[in-house]
Swiss-Prot record:
<feature type="binding site">
    <location>
        <position position="36"/>
    </location>
    <ligand>
        <name>AMP</name>
    </ligand>
</feature>
<feature type="region of interest" description="LID">
    <location>
        <begin position="127"/>
        <end position="160"/>
    </location>
</feature>
<dbReference type="InterPro" id="IPR033690">
    <property type="entry name" value="Adenylat_kinase_CS"/>
</dbReference>
<feature type="binding site">
    <location>
        <position position="128"/>
    </location>
    <ligand>
        <name>ATP</name>
    </ligand>
</feature>
<dbReference type="GO" id="GO:0004017">
    <property type="term" value="F:adenylate kinase activity"/>
</dbReference>
<dbReference type="GO" id="GO:0005524">
    <property type="term" value="F:ATP binding"/>
</dbReference>
<feature type="binding site">
    <location>
        <position position="93"/>
    </location>
    <ligand>
        <name>AMP</name>
    </ligand>
</feature>
<dbReference type="GO" id="GO:0005737">
    <property type="term" value="C:cytoplasm"/>
</dbReference>
<keyword id="KW-0808">Transferase</keyword>
<feature type="region of interest" description="NMP">
    <location>
        <begin position="30"/>
        <end position="59"/>
    </location>
</feature>
<dbReference type="Pfam" id="PF00406">
    <property type="entry name" value="ADK"/>
</dbReference>
<dbReference type="InterPro" id="IPR006259">
    <property type="entry name" value="Adenyl_kin_sub"/>
</dbReference>
<feature type="binding site">
    <location>
        <position position="31"/>
    </location>
    <ligand>
        <name>AMP</name>
    </ligand>
</feature>
<feature type="binding site">
    <location>
        <begin position="86"/>
        <end position="89"/>
    </location>
    <ligand>
        <name>AMP</name>
    </ligand>
</feature>
<comment type="pathway">
    <text>Purine metabolism; AMP biosynthesis via salvage pathway; AMP from ADP: step 1/1.</text>
</comment>
<dbReference type="InterPro" id="IPR000850">
    <property type="entry name" value="Adenylat/UMP-CMP_kin"/>
</dbReference>
<feature type="binding site">
    <location>
        <position position="196"/>
    </location>
    <ligand>
        <name>ATP</name>
    </ligand>
</feature>
Amino acid sequence: MNLLIMGLPGAGKGTQAAKIVEKFNVAHISTGDMFRAAMANQTEMGILAKSYIDKGDLVPDEVTNGIVKERLVQDDIKEKGFLLDGYPRTIEQAHALDENLADLGIELQGVINIEIDPSKLVERLSGRIIHKETGETFHKVFNPPVGDYKEEDFYQREDDKPESVKRRLEVNIAQGQPIIDHYRAKGLVHDIEGDQDIDLVFQAIDTVLSKLQ
């Protein structure tokens, strides 16, 4: 099976990706792992990517797309198929992926889209607090500190504050929605309700993927 998984930050995409890989034995292609491997193996695109990263520059799309293409021709993909996680991030990358898959004779079979109301994600993502003395991490709702603590004993990182989280989600929605629309027009998108127990989310994914096998 050849799949994409999509979802906003905090939607549980990483957790579900791991479960899909374990159950369906597909190769997990995550952007970070792919870049690290390409640079470590000094592939043509890996060397190019490193030259940008070393200068502190953003890696251009054509290099990112090239790294993905290099990964897609490897033996484990031919044997098992893949789950792409964290790519494409823009509609331009989605078009490049379509072209690369067509060049390689690979068919994309499904896009798993984990959906959660963004306002609930703000609560999930902005609840993290850190104890000033110990550095221990808690969550205001899901893992509150127990014991003789005061509010002033904790601090919150700037990018965990609600306004920062909202801005981050807005950027992700603006970039991600055109990609989902693009694949929905091809009949590939399977929407999964993400605001439920982790096992129930996977149950829904499992039902979809079992039909695609």
